[in-house]
Regions:
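Bacterial N-terminal signal peptides that target proteins for export
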Residues: 1-8
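N-terminal signal peptide c-region/cleavage motif recognized by signal peptidases
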Residues: 15-20
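Short, glycine-/small- and polar/acidic-enriched structural segments
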Residues: 24-152, 156, 160-161, 165-169
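A bilobed periplasmic-binding-protein/Venus flytrap-type ligand-binding module shared by bacterial periplasmic
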Residues: 42-43, 106-116, 198-214, 267
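N-terminal secretory/targeting leader peptides
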Residues: 51-54, 183, 245, 271
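Pocket-lining segment of extracytoplasmic ligand-binding domains
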Residues: 82, 148, 152-246
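Secondary-structure end/capping motifs
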Residues: 210-291
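Conserved C-terminal helix/tail region of periplasmic/extracytoplasmic solute-binding proteins
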Residues: 280-311
Length: 311
């Protein structure tokens, strides 16, 4: 009888230990599945090799990634560093721990036969834009331009018809999608104008305070997955393209090459790295357009300690 009790206690202890080790986190993306998210989908594909299970959840219209992460509905979210600071100005308590792109690939796309050479040449034109987007507030203030803004609905046919309008998008995808439909484009990137927020994975300060080991494990997993997905992009391409039909395989693979050329470090050991100076630069730009208060402390919105090896 004592032996049976002992075995039962041992079994319960083993079950408890197994349950305690069954760690799981959810990463909420900034948009539908697409190539700039490859690192996160690769991490999910690698789950069988690790105790920590990383689930990736697609974003999209009407999904507020920052708000859901701040509320604890998910453990991590993906957005621009400008969105993180704007949310923190309202008390969200978010902290970026990993950059998946050196800058969000915001771009302004227009028809090439309109005589547009500079940002000022877009003044007064119709503009398909995500209403209230932070970068456009800064562009208007910095360059003194305005536009006839209307909500972006992703209607490429409208852009093809209206020769004088311009449209926001990601430089990794929008020009290539239009080219595939026979529509020639030119573009002005926000990075070329001096606005360059990181694309970042963030969590909450509460998570960092209560479970820093878990945050570190996620960051380490992402670094390994990132290099893996860049060296062999086919598995993540298969997964992403099965979930979203907005781009072809050629466009997806082209975006990966653009990322490697212009958005990622050549040394893959530096993947995920960020610099304090860039956060301070962006904070000053956000203060310029009253997106954060004048006394806002940018350092409260990021934590470099999980990255290491970034010098």
């Amino acid at each position: 009888m004592k032996l049976l009790k002992s075995l039962a206690v041992s079994a319960m202890a083993l079950l408890f230990a197994a349950t305690a080790q069954a760690k799981e986190v959810t990463l909420l993306m900034d948009w539908f599945p697409q190539g700039n998210q490859s690192v996160f989908w690769q991490a999910m594909l690698d789950n069988d090799e690790h105790d920590l299970k990383i689930n990736v959840k697609a974003g999209g219209p009407g999904i507020n990634t920052a708000a859901q992460t701040a509320a604890g509905s998910v453990e991590f979210g993906l957005q621009g560093s400008d969105s993180v600071m704007a949310a923190n100005a309202k008390g969200a308590g978010l902290v970026a721990v990993f950059a998946n792109l050196d800058h969000v690939p915001y771009t302004l796309v227009f028809h090439p036969d309109q005589g547009i050479k500079t940002i000022q040449d877009l003044d007064g034109r119709r503009f398909a834009v995500k209403m209230g987007v932070t970068y456009w507030k800064w562009v208007k203030a910095e360059y003194g331009v305005s536009a006839d803004e209307f909500p972006l609905k992703g209607d490429l046919a409208l852009f093809a018809r209206e020769k004088e309008m311009f449209q926001q998008g990601y430089s990794l995808f929008l020009p290539a999608r239009l080219a595939a439909q026979g529509v020639a484009t030119d573009q002005i990137t926000l990075e070329s104008l001096g606005y360059r927020p990181y694309s970042v994975l963030f969590t909450t300060q509460k998570m960092i305070d209560e479970n820093p080991e878990l945050v570190q494990e996620v960051v380490d997993r992402l670094r390994a997955a990132f290099a893996k997905s860049l060296n062999n992009p086919d598995p993540t391409a298969d997964l992403i393209l099965s979930k979203s039909k907005k781009v072809t395989r050629d466009i997806h693979m082209g975006a990966i090459e653009l990322m490697k050329a212009d958005f990622l470090p050549k040394d893959y050991s530096k993947l995920g790295c960020m610099k304090s100076e860039r956060w301070e630069e962006l904070s000053a730009q956000l203060k310029q357009v009253d997106m954060v208060p004048g006394d806002f402390d940018a350092s409260s919105s990021y934590n470099l300690s999980f990255l290491g090896n970034c010098e």
